[in-house]
Amino acid sequence: VAGAAVLRTTGGRAGTAQLGRDGIARIESEIVKLGSPQTTWFSARACTVPGPSGQSVLMTLQSIHGSDFFGPVQWTATADLGRTWSEPRPIPSLGRRRVDAEIEEGVCDVVPEYHAATKTVLAIGHNVFYRPKGFYRPQPPRWPVYAVRSPEGVWSEARRLPWDDPRGSNIYTCNCAQRSMLDNGHLLIPFSFGPQGRADRSVATAEVSFDGRELKILRMGPELRLNAGRGLLEPSLARFDGRYFLTLRAEDDRGYVTTSDDGLRWAPIRPWCWDDGEPLAMSTTQQRWLMHSDALRLVYTRKSAENAKVFRWRAPLYVAEVDRRQLRLIRSSERVAMALAGDAERHPKDVEQLGNFHTVAADPGQSWITVGAFAPSTFKGPLRISRVFWTRPNRG
């Protein structure tokens, strides 16, 4: 990778390969070693970037030092499908700035995506406020923050994505979200938002224009709401076979799903269930779409016999195919996408948390699940990648 020292990744595979069925040939997990051995990486999310000498994968990530307490946003890249990675480097505009003597403002929960119409990488997260030794409570108002990487590899200054609507007076954000590209170069971005004085957040999707420098919200669809805890959080969007699908984190021991013809107006939400109708037990954790041209899959966490004592059941990661007609998961297709690491029965606080993850189609033959793992007892853990190898090429 130009302009960066090259590092060797992990040695052997850390996970056990699972042999093919349902379009997945096998899944292999590995540990990626980046930067200082003392650094624990978090929010590892990647996108593919075409280039004159071939396709690379760019990943944003940041160090974690405590609960919701992160270092500046950094980036790394690989041009050889993850055999080597560049030295992590800060994105200068996505660092911290001092607000006053007690408070600093940073950026977190960043998702990078390549924008083909402008040949740029658009990295969107949201602002966050810290005291010297941790997360600031209560948080002041929060909003989306983004930076743009030019075709020449230069990162822009950070910008706020404005939305002048009282429904987002306390928070409006598209943190951690998978978004969708429209044929005209516009984006469909799912947002969660809430006004001052209300605990639960709503979700809606917006059509957003992007000219290579600036994002503008053009229109926002009707909102979805669930009056339980903090409501609906961290939505992720997918388009498959002409329809849009939205998966939603919630705080009532469920995850939710809905579908739309235009990506703006959604059917009523319904809990994620197996194809026999049994609801999945999910504890306030995001889900991600794993896209393949032949089938739509979901990556998720859920309660199981082995993880009942693990915080929010955030290990292992599972993957299953979606029955798109019923909007349910096909139970027989479920497999472990990233295994639980640790003794979940006797030492659950030492089990690596896998709940903040992302997916990327690395090439037609494999897709990745990227996770900055950590144990709640120490906030230490490795950067992990599960490679999902397909039986048939992913046509995008």
Residue ranges, per PLM feature:
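Beta-rich carbohydrate-recognition and catalytic domains
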Residues: G15-T40, C47-E105, Y114-Y172, S180-E234, ...
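N-terminal export signals
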Residues: V1-A14
